Regions:
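Long compositionally biased, domain-poor regions of proteins
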Residues: 130, 147, 273-275, 288-302, ...
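Double-stranded beta-helix
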Residues: 132-214, 325, 329-366
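Glycine- and acidic-residue-biased ligand/ion/polar-headgroup-sensing regions
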Residues: 85-104, 281-305
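A short, N-terminal "cap"/entry segment at the start of jelly-roll beta-barrel domains
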Residues: 19-70, 172-268, 273-274, 361-366
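Fungal secretory targeting signals
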Residues: 1-20
Length: 366
């Protein structure tokens, strides 16, 4: 290992040894950390929506931003239709329901997303969404990072809820803050938001999807073999792979591949069982950054002799070059992963995995 690489790793380990993994907001520099679900992580409101930012540009070395949006149902769009020319935006439904539209070229796709569903909005794609259930949470991943600056600019107010409630329980304006005046739109261009006000979202969804006959919660959702087009993956209806060589069963379900992420990031879910009897603990040391968002169960994440028990909704960030291990404390755990680059945790697991037809692992150890 080069001397400069050793110094780089030590510089990351030093603050980790001095401070707890648990923080209440994303750090201003790259270090390992964990944030509790609904912590006031730079929380702000835009209309009726409350946004939190467990991973930011500064905390990820500008590789990606992760944001949580909590809001009640609304009869209006959550944001004006718009395009990003430099940012790939990803939508995941943690709970509740929302509708997502994506238009590119001559095609307009739409899906009704429920818990576990995913939608990919690559660059140059017109998109918008509408929140439909009283307790909805969207997990957004935007690459590259620092996209949170847009929301800081648009914020109605910064908030710090004493009770850590998901959002303000009050009848508030549904104005998403993206504005319709030429002045506001011009300012938003600097944040890579280009208004597409001529786009009218179609409402002719059948069984939660558009166009007619689109595969959704009724058959295998394939991931495109090329990049650039929007696509959707229904919960547990995408490709699945089983890894049984790391001391525990792990089922990997990719949403974003090295191809569709254009080499910048990958994303998906990993379902994890308890460690096999007498199996040794696997230690990982990735070349690039990793974020985990727990969806179900409980996961013990160990870094530099500190173990954080992550529960549903919690987020952890592990920088590249930092050794770590993780185990499922529960019989069945599942987390959303975001890996910077193309050599992330998912790719390491997939290298020793086999195609699998089920979202759960086998009944007996290998």
């Amino acid at each position: 290992m080069h001397h400069s690489t050793v110094l780089s790793v030590l510089s990351l380990l030093a603050p980790a040894a001095q401070a707890s993994l648990w923080v209440d907001r994303a750090p201003s520099y790259v270090r390992p950390y964990a944030i509790e679900h609904y912590a006031n992580a730079n929380a702000l409101t835009i209309g009726s929506q409350t946004y939190r930012f467990p991973v930011t540009g500064p905390s990820s070395g500008n590789r990606f931003t992760m944001l949580m949006t909590n809001a009640p149902q609304s009869g209006d769009l959550g944001v004006l239709p718009h395009i990003h020319e430099q940012h790939h935006e990803n939508f995941f439904c943690y709970k509740g329901r929302f509708q997502l539209w994506a238009h590119k070229g001559n095609d307009t796709e739409a899906r009704l997303l429920t818990a576990g569903d995913y939608g990919s909005v690559p660059v140059d794609t017109t998109h918008t969404f509408q929140i439909l259930d009283p307790d909805t949470e969207m997990v957004g991943v935007v690459a590259p990072g620092s996209f949170e600056d847009l929301f800081y600019f648009l914020a109605t107010q910064n908030v710090s809820y004493e009770t850590q409630t998901p959002y303000t329980p009050a009848n508030l304006s549904d104005d998403a803050g993206s504005g319709s005046s030429a002045d506001i739109i011009t300012q938003l261009v600097s944040f890579d938001v280009h208004a597409a006000l001529n786009f009218t979202p179609p409402r002719d969804l059948v069984n939660g999807s558009r166009p007619a006959g689109a595969i959704w919660h009724d058959d295998i959702n394939e991931i495109p073999s090329s990049s650039g087009s929007p696509y959707f993956v229904a919960s547990n209806w995408g490709p699945k792979y089983l890894n049984n060589v790391t001391g525990a069963y792990q089922v990997v379900q990719p949403f974003v591949t090295p191809t569709t992420g254009e080499g910048n990031f990958t994303q998906g879910t990993i379902t994890l069982g308890r460690r096999f009897l007498n199996a040794s603990r696997q230690t990982w040391n990735l070349t690039d950054h990793l974020a985990l968002n727990i969806l179900e169960g409980a996961v013990d994440l160990t870094i530099a002799n500190e173990t954080a028990t992550l529960l549903a909704g919690d987020v952890a960030f592990v920088p590249g070059g930092i050794p770590f291990s993780y185990d499922s404390r529960a019989a069945f755990s599942k987390f959303l992963y975001v890996s910077a680059g193309v050599k992330g945790l998912d790719q390491q697991l997939l290298a020793d995995a086999a195609e699998w037809s089920w979202p759960v692992f086998p009944t007996t150890s290998p």
